[in-house]
């Protein structure tokens, strides 16, 4: 590719860094609130995920949030500050790895810049997710596989690095294990000999041993049984949309998945990746020997393919699910677009080139538009002195961020340090803004309201609720999330349907007030 000027490089680095810093002003989303509360429990109470609280995500995301809160304190922007610093480090590492394997600094820089655009423009709800923090272990696996193939480093050291990274991915989210699987497939495609089989075995063994050590830890602290229960529960949770039903095929695989894919990446970026892989296929079909760089693109293409297949398997297709493949897609995008630009410069007449470039720009509009609608917008809201919570409710009427803060402003002065609070609902930022921690296993009530929820979870929650005797009992209305918990009732209706919880509330609490969707009950007497 043509070398970039020093000015262009400086602009790319500066604008990319600015986009990352703008995330500091992103509001507190639904998932970020739940992860922060779990992280706060880990930090302040030494809580163990699954044993002390339930969620649909594996445990490592809560440890990450606990680190963010430890460094920056109890603020809704703490995870944003941590995410920014994390990405500065992650992208620097990604850049160094790409330079090492591709031998092209400009290609590496453009790949990192496109990654920043894709990630920061996904918005406040879709950032700081489990997939977000998968970039470093994913790149570690990719890099150490390539190091082994090129004969660099000690095989055992490379295998241990892959094992540690794979374990991290598994406990961030099990479907992220497509990364080591893709590298293993590529490894065995590339060369098959005793040394390679030994390396593959060592990598798998390291993953199993390190995973077993963490599982042993969970067992030793009494969390393993519930971990297994959560694993079974999540299988049903993921099966809300059956894998091969006609409805899933038409609504998810044919409509939602490809539509979100195009909107997130843009037709231009997808075409760039496809063109890169097309030229590799063309070389293979012509029985030409692939270059080392083409093999690297093939490795990245396999990573992107399996990552996107995992998104289809999960069947939720939220934008953040696609972020697991950003790191693998961006070098392919750059390579493909360089092919296009080279073609335009050599084949298209100079008078028409500007029209071709304009067309390329038009087909890149989805992420470019979101630069204005996400990082720039939220920065403007903050600098203009506007209420982010009000803007959130104006644009996302079903996410009551402003009402969480209003509830906290009203009731925080009534609570002492020793007073407990119980929340029954989905939008658990209430806990965070009240600066209170759950005293039951319930963060969001999703794990307890599904038809397949284990009875012992409900029994445990009721026992903990009676023992902690919270001063406030807060429940939520109009938070129906059938696409998540497969129920047609909101949290208040679910409470009424659960006889034990309804009787407990009626017997021990009196209605105090409503703040938007939240109904607040005050304890009658000491229980």
Question: Where are the regions a protein language model picked out?
Answer:
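Extracytoplasmic
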Residues: 57, 174-176, 357-526
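Perimembrane helix-loop-helix junctions
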Residues: 1-2, 179-208, 280-288, 337, ...
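Membrane-interface alpha helices of multi-pass inner-membrane proteins
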Residues: 156-174, 180-185, 205, 209, ...
């Amino acid at each position: 590719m043509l070398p970039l000027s020093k000015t262009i490089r400086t602009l790319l680095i500066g604008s990319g860094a600015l986009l990352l810093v703008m995330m500091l002003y992103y509001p507190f989303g639904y998932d970020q609130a739940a992860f922060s509360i779990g992280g706060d429990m880990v930090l302040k109470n030494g809580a163990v995920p699954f044993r002390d609280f339930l969620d649909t995500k594996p445990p490592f995301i809560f440890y990450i949030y606990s680190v963010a809160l430890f460094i920056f304190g109890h603020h809704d922007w703490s995870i944003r500050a941590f995410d920014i610093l994390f990405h500065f480090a992650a992208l620097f590492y990604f850049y160094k790895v790409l330079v090492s394997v591709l031998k092209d600094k400009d290609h590496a820089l453009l790949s990192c810049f496109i990654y920043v655009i894709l990630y920061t423009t996904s918005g406040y709800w879709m950032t700081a997710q489990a997939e977000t923090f998968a970039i470093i272990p994913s790149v570690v696996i990719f890099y150490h596989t390539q190091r082994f193939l090129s004969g660099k480093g000690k095989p055992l050291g490379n295998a241990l690095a892959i094992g540690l990274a794979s374990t991290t991915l598994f406990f961030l989210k099990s479907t992220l294990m497509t990364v080591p699987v893709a590298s293993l497939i590529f490894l065995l495609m590339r060369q098959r000999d005793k040394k390679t089989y030994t390396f593959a075995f060592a990598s798998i063994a390291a993953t199993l041993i390190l995973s077993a050590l963490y599982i042993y830890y969970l067992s030793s602290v009494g969390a393993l049984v519930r971990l297994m229960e959560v694993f079974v529960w999540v299988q049903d949770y993921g099966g809300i949309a059956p894998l091969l039903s006609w409805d899933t095929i038409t609504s998810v695989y044919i409509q939602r998945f490809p539509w979100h894919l195009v909107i997130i990446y843009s037709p231009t970026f997808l075409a760039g990746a496809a063109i890169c892989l097309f030229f590799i296929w063309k070389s293979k079909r012509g029985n030409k020997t692939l270059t080392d760089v083409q093999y690297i693109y093939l490795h990245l293409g396999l990573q992107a393919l399996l990552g996107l297949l995992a998104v289809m398997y999960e069947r939720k297709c939220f934008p953040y699910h696609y972020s697991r493949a950003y790191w693998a897609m961006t070098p392919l995008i750059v390579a493909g677009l360089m092919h296009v630009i080279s073609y335009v410069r050599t084949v298209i007449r100079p008078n028409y080139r500007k029209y071709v470039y304009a067309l390329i720009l038009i087909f890149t509009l989805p992420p470019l538009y979101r630069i204005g609608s996400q990082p720039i917008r939220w920065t403007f809201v903050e600098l203009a002195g506007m209420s982010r919570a009000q803007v959130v409710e104006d644009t996302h009427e079903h996410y009551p961020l402003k009402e969480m803060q209003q509830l906290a402003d009203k009731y925080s002065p009534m609570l002492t340090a020793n007073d407990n609070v119980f929340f029954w609902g989905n939008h658990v930022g209430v806990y965070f803004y009240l600066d209170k921690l759950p005293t039951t296993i319930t963060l969001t009530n999703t794990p307890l309201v599904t038809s397949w929820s284990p009875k012992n979870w409900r029994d445990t929650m009721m026992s903990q609720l009676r023992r902690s005797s919270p001063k406030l009992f807060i429940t939520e209305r109009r938070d129906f999330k059938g696409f998540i918990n497969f129920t047609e009732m909101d949290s208040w209706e679910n409470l009424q349907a659960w006889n034990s919880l309804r009787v407990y509330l009626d017997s021990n609490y009196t209605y105090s007030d409503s703040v938007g969707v939240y109904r607040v009950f005050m304890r009658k007497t000491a229980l």
